[in-house]
């Protein structure tokens, strides 16, 4: 764990101090012993008439700002990025990631600077530039995958719909096979959290946050970073639109499950093609490069660049901090109910 002592600020009786409010009034610093202590201090005095508590209360971002003052010059080559895609049995239809009932039968993970590593369940002779790990069963496959993951410790994992499907399915499937919280091995700190929400207003979606690993979904990144609506956001359509390329065609087999049962070699090639297409999209579009530049400029997490509130709050906080100005107290807004005749 990281020991950090954040500060808050209160109005000063002195005529001048190193810190000032947004309106120029001098402030005194209040040194707190921990982030928990800082939260309690703010909660205790917030909203009390005549007592103002100044200072930014997103302590992760104040820590980054204190730890890395000034402009951050980052080395993009030092950031380890990989594209991930998994395949599951689908005899009973498309598997639900929140339940993860079906067996994982292939995983491809492609470092941006290394060969693709494929974990599968059968013999495969390929001329493509891949490293193939032939596993005895699904438990062996997931064990080998976790071992590789922990050996590499990628900073960013991307892929097409990787956040809502691949990572959610993997985490739930690992827990189903190896016990509750076994998926936490995918975090360098053995810590995670999950949240559920309705996507598009109706689709129940579960997302895992693996502490220490940034999951940056290329589908969401593409949606955010392009300025035209597409007819479809399936990888096959977008790859054809942007690159003139498509996913591997298996129409002669009718379904992905039939392909898996009858031509496992082609099934693995299909899996590999998906991660390669995402990497080629990034080579052309550079959206991950842009995300990194934005995050280091704002001193925030990569995922914060997807929204506007945290991103701009953090930029404003750092700008004001350089002027010796502390962010003003938050005001609670009462919700008024209006009767409509």
Question: Which ranges hold each PLM region?
Answer:
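The two-metal-ion catalytic cores of nucleic-acid processing enzymes
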Residues: 1-219, 225-341
């Amino acid at each position: 764990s990281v020991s950090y002592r954040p500060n808050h600020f209160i109005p000063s009786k002195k005529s001048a101090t190193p810190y000032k409010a947004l309106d120029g009034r001098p402030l005194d610093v209040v040194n707190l012993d921990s982030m928990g202590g800082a939260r309690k201090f703010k909660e205790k005095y917030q909203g009390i008439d005549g007592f103002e508590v100044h200072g930014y209360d997103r302590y992760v971002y104040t820590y980054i700002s204190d730890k890395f003052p000034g402009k951050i010059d980052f080395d993009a080559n030092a950031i380890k990025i990989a594209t991930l895609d998994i395949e599951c049995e689908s005899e009973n239809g498309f598997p639900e990631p929140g339940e993860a009932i079906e067996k994982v039968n292939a995983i491809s993970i492609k470092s941006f600077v290394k060969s693709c590593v494929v974990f599968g369940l059968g013999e495969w002779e390929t001329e493509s530039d891949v490293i193939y790990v032939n596993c005895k069963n699904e438990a062996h496959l997931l064990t080998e995958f976790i071992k590789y993951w922990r050996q590499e410790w990628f900073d960013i994992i991307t892929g097409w719909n990787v956040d809502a499907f691949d990572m959610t399915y993997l985490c739930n499937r690992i827990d189903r096979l190896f016990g509750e919280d076994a998926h936490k091995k995918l975090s360098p700190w053995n810590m995670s959290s999950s949240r559920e929400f309705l996507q598009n207003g109706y689709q129940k979606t579960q997302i895992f946050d693996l502490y220490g690993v940034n999951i940056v979904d290329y589908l969401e990144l593409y949606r955010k970073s392009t300025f035209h609506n597409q007819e479809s956001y399936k990888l096959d359509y977008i790859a054809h639109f942007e690159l003139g390329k498509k996913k591997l065609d298996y129409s002669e087999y009718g379904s992905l499950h039939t392909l898996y049962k009858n031509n496992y070699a082609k099934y693995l090639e299909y899996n590999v093609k998906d991660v390669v297409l995402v990497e080629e999209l990034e080579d052309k579009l550079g959206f991950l490069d842009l995300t990194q530049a934005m995050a280091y400029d704002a001193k925030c997490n990569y995922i914060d660049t997807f929204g506007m509130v945290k991103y701009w709050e953090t930029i404003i906080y750092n700008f004001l901090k350089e002027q010796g100005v502390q962010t003003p107290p938050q005001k609670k807004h009462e919700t008024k109910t209006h009767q409509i005749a």
